[in-house]
Curated annotation (Swiss-Prot):
Similarity comment: family membership: Belongs to the paramyxoviruses nucleocapsid family.
Residues reported in the UniProt entry to bind RNA: K180, R195, Q202, Y260, N351
High-level lineage: Viruses, Riboviria, Orthornavirae, Negarnaviricota, Haploviricotina
Function: Forms the helical nucleocapsid (NC) in a ratio of 1 N per 6 ribonucleotides, protecting the genome from nucleases. The nucleocapsid (NC) has a helical structure with either 12.35 or 11.64 N per turn, approximately 20 nm in diameter, with a hollow central cavity approximately 5 nm in diameter. The encapsidated genomic RNA serves as template for transcription and replication; encapsidation by N is coupled to RNA synthesis. Forms the encapsidation complex with the phosphoprotein protein P. Before encapsidation, the newly synthesized free N protein, so-called N0, is chaperoned by P.
Keyword Phosphoprotein: yes
Transmembrane regions: none
Subcellular location: Virion; Host cytoplasm; Host nucleus
UniProt keyword list: Capsid protein, Helical capsid protein, Host cytoplasm, Host nucleus, Host-virus interaction, Phosphoprotein, Ribonucleoprotein, RNA-binding, Viral nucleoprotein, Virion
Domain writeup: Ncore is globular and carries regions required for N self-assembly and RNA-binding. Ntail is an intrinsically disordered monomeric domain in the C-terminus.
Region (Ncore): 1-403
Region (Ntail): 404-525
Post-translational modification: Phosphorylation at Thr-279 is required for the formation of the nucleocapsid.
Residue numbers covered by motif Nuclear localization signal: 70-77
Name by which UniProt lists this protein: Nucleoprotein
Amino acid sequence: MATLLRSLALFKRNKDKPPITSGSGGAIRGIKHIIIVPIPGDSSITTRSRLLDRLVRLIGNPDVSGPKLTGALIGILSLFVESPGQLIQRITDDPDVSIRLLEVVQSDQSQSGLTFASRGTNMEDEADQYFSHDDPISSDQSRFGWFENKEISDIEVQDPEGFNMILGTILAQIWVLLAKAVTAPDTAADSELRRWIKYTQQRRVVGEFRLERKWLDVVRNIIAEDLSLRRFMVALILDIKRTPGNKPRIAEMICDIDTYIVEAGLASFILTIKFGIETMYPALGLHEFAGELSTLESLMNLYQQMGKPAPYMVNLENSIQNKFSAGSYPLLWSYAMGVGVELENSMGGLNFGRSYFDPAYFRLGQEMVRRSAGKVSSTLASELGITAEDARLVSEIAMHTTEDKISRAVGPRQAQVSFLQGDQSENELPRLGGKEDRRVKQSRGEARESYRETGPSRASDARAAHLPTGTPLDIDTASESSQDPQDSRRSAEPLLRLQAMAGISEEQGSDTDTPTVYNDRNLLD
């Protein structure tokens, strides 16, 4: 048996290992397409600011698409460094594209004010054609979808400080788009606006240079579609992180935005570790979790073996990302989500509508948190030097805090309906007093009579018909238990029926001598 277990552990490790690049096989290269990236040909701030202005207009032009957009974005992303050409050549290793650098200098003979650097050849016409200045109609279109402040006609400046502020403002808006361009583009606008407000308050960006929504939508779409652009952005982030010493202000801002980009698309894996394993609840000892715990251990080792690009595997479209999906450990993931919605309010808005979601283990996680409230881990207490008296004090305080949280209905709405608790007893009903209290007592008596005459099903309807409207009923998450036949009386359908019956009985008034009993068929009619 010991040999079998060792073989199993070795099999799991080898199964999840990334492929090793060895053997006599040659490198597989795809059919490359050429991307032209304009870069400044001198160190003049005027050249850089004019190039930035022309590239922003070029991206806003609806007639421009494909590799030309990608080259323009790479040119903007590399403008903050002293030598953009060296940076691009150093970090670019893409098997799908071939990047051609095109140096740009000032020119008084072209409509765009720029020309391509060449030896003895006039390239003004080619520069105007590239920057879409050869057609007046196209030039007008390039201004559409630019800045929200229409009073800004251009962003050409001559001092380095002003240029860095404008460039940093534009780069911040571009980098924020990478956070959800691939994983959640439909809900990205709200989070992008929060990031913009944050950096505006920190004076990292200038509010007047807020780009229009249409311009941002174009950039978000090209980021989502173009893998080569995302590879360049991830390579640039990793290169900035490797830079020793103090970094430029724009580089520090990019690292700050990276906290929203890193581990995008890996929420299931990260949250399962956080709430399923790190909480160290005794439920981890279940036999059902043994295999998935071994799988998760192998995935954590694989994550470390992948190195620095591991947190960006979804943005890089790495095929190994499928191993980290929640479908590889569905029971442990469902349990971790139940723990999460009880511990953190932010987890209440997560969507659990997956085919492999198991409501039984979700409720296990919820109940594990509720019943373990106020308990102190003996192992952790011994490591921290906590005495038994201190542990009792902490447990007492934690229990009062938990009760206060439940009484104020604080937390995610998933936590307000228990799937494992029984029905509320008569002594636990809220005291209403006066006429309403008498009505509740009357309904209880009628319910007992109805139980003796018609059986438990009709009696339950009689009790529901006179439930006071002040009783809180939360049905937002009751649908999660509808898949379990044993919990059908606590599912969304009975709760909806109770609420509807309470409304009907309230309309009849308090002077009714013989209250009417409504069943399911009455409500459906």
